[in-house]
Amino acid sequence: MIKKVSVIGTGVIGTGWVIRCLTHNKKVIAFDKDIKLKKKLIVEIKRVWPFVKKLFNKNKLNLKNFKFVTSIEEAVKTADFIQECAPENYAQKIKLMNIIGKFARPKAIIASSSSGLLPTKIYSKCKNPSRTMIGHPFNPVYLCPGVEIVPGKKTNKFFLNKAKKFYKSISMNPIMVKKELPGYLSDRLQEALWREGLHIINEGYATTKDLDRAIEDGPGIRYSLMGTFLTFHLAGGKAGMKHMLKQFGPALKLPWTKLKAPKLTKKLSYRIIKGTKQQSRGKSVASLSNIRDEYLVNLLKMRKKYESKIRK
């Protein structure tokens, strides 16, 4: 059983992992190079706790299971599970995994929070790569239950299954990707939506607010309970997906999308930055994060009542 977790890097994603693991009574050792980041991390833990408490029915925050260190060796040498959260950079991750592999226990699982890099390459210089994989979460990690588990070419199924059990023990819903591919699953879908949005803005058809509303008030409401395929299955009526493909399949030949990304010019960047600034209406990122977190807590609590009827 995995009891002690090491989180390497305390940025947005690393902080989320620390909070989720502490919430589920795991001993957590957080690593970062600057000791000053410890204070920042604790401040964020305390900000988030009211939302975590409400979602997971926890009484009070216990920091006795939390330790902050500035040595990778100290962070990983006694850990059962290591969750790496360094920037999306092959050279940096390869170097880091080499160090982690040297100091980690032989059977300690090493998972990268990478959102699109290939695990085989990330762990190319890591000792015992059979216990390595991707464990890609969604932001905010402390609330969102999804995590994509992506194996490398040398990953052993024993460790994949062990990682799956661990993520379930901290109230996550593991998505097992059959083999490695750039961007994994969710980010490839999000990237397609993002690129299409950039084209629409670049060509002057809509603002960032218009596009966000098109998702928020349309498919986004459904997607929190049912994904694209089940949603389209329902669109086919009584005959389901069979009729849907027959009815709407020809639309695949229509020029409805441009998946190749447009050039990110200064003009396009300005439109996007200006648009999102206007959408924020003067609210800080922290303030908007609080609103989002409160919404997600209530949404997830409500979803539990219905998802069991679909996913039995």
Label the model's feature ranges.
Residues 2, 24, 172, 176-178, ...:
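NAD(P)-dependent Rossmann-like dehydrogenase/reductase catalytic/cofactor-binding core
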Residues 16, 141-150, 170, 175, ...:
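Active-site-proximal catalytic alpha-helix in oxidoreductases
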Residues 28, 82, 110-111, 132:
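Hydrophobic/aromatic residues located in beta-strands of well-ordered beta-sheets
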Residues 33, 51-109, 117:
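Rossmann-like NAD(P)-binding element
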Residues 112-179, 183, 187:
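Rossmann-fold dinucleotide-binding core
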